[in-house]
């Protein structure tokens, strides 16, 4: 019985790609929130690669396919997988972000709509990313010119996505897009469509606003006031490993080490044993 249930949870990813060097390594990452972990590697032989996995407990794995080769952009292909799905990946060049994913998974089909909407621009964006990677030793002026070009392309893609999002119902993929747009608003000076993004954010119900993505979007759209030297430190409900709540105000007058880190930060995780000793 267990073999049958295992087979029912299994999905396959079959790749057929042209214009890619034989012997190129491909890695499959499983994304959990902001953290990605490698769950498989394969080598492209005669233009093919293959992965087989059991879906996680949530019933939907969010994956990304990546090649670290210098012919490739430092980007990855987004894949959504569910139990029993037979997924086919095809490409004609190393522009991996726009390789085609033929899949029965609803989230994948929705994601594909966004890609197709800006395929020409994404291809150009990837070519620039490859060029920028090979220009590490170039002058700052040349690199800045490339970045300005990338920012302009990115801004047009964002505007196209905004237009598409107005027509689509809210879903997980839609929320991911809104999060990406809110980050662009924060970091890309060429992207200035704040009113339109706020209008999309206003479509969210309370539960969606309270989700992890919803909270991140809110912080990007309404940046919190930063604390200056000499001000009272910003405070919040901080939970220890036993789930007990603490506040920074409880430690007033004492020395304190605050370690800020990103959820998927490798060096931070490696430093944990030392932090515990302190």
Describe each PLM feature range.
Residues 1-7:
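Hydrophobic h-region of N-terminal signal peptides that target proteins for export
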Residues 7-152, 156-159:
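A non-transmembrane, solvent-exposed segment enriched in polar/low-complexity residues
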Residues 147-149, 185-194:
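Short coil/turn connectors between adjacent alpha-helices in alpha-solenoid helical repeat scaffolds
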Residues 167-185, 215:
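Amphipathic alpha-helical repeat scaffolds of TPR domains
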Residues 192-204, 231-237:
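Alpha-helical repeat scaffolds
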Residues 215-248:
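N-terminal "domain-start" segment that seeds a small globular fold
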Residues 252-277:
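Conserved redox-active cysteine motifs that mediate thiol-disulfide chemistry
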């Amino acid at each position: 019985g267990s073999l049958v249930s295992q087979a029912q949870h299994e999905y396959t990813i079959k790749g057929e790609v042209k214009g890619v060097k034989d012997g190129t390594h491909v890695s499959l990452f499983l994304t959990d929130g902001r953290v990605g972990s490698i769950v498989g590697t394969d080598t492209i032989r005669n233009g093919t690669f293959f992965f087989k996995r059991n879906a996680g407990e949530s019933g939907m794995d969010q994956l990304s396919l990546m090649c670290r080769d210098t012919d490739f952009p430092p980007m990855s292909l987004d894949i959504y997988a569910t139990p029993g799905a037979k997924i086919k990946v095809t490409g004609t060049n190393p522009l991996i972000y726009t390789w085609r994913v033929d899949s029965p998974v609803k989230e994948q089909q929705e994601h594909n709509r966004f890609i197709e909407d800006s395929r020409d621009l994404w291809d150009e964006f990837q070519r620039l990313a490859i060029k920028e990677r090979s220009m590490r030793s170039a002058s700052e002026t040349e690199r800045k010119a490339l970045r300005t070009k990338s920012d302009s392309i990115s801004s047009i893609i964002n505007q196209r996505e905004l237009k598409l999002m107005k027509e689509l119902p809210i879903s997980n993929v839609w929320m991911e897009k809104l999060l990406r747009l809110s980050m662009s608003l924060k970091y890309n000076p060429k992207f200035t469509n704040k009113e339109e993004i706020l209008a999309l954010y206003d479509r969210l119900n309370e539960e969606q606003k309270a989700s992890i993505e919803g909270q991140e979007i809110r912080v990007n759209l309404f940046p919190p006031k930063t604390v200056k030297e000499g001000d009272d430190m910003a405070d919040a409900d901080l939970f220890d490993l036993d789930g007990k709540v603490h506040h920074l105000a409880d430690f007033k007058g004492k020395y304190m080490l605050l370690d800020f880190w990103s959820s998927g930060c490798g060096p931070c995780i490696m430093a944990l044993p030392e932090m515990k000793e302190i």
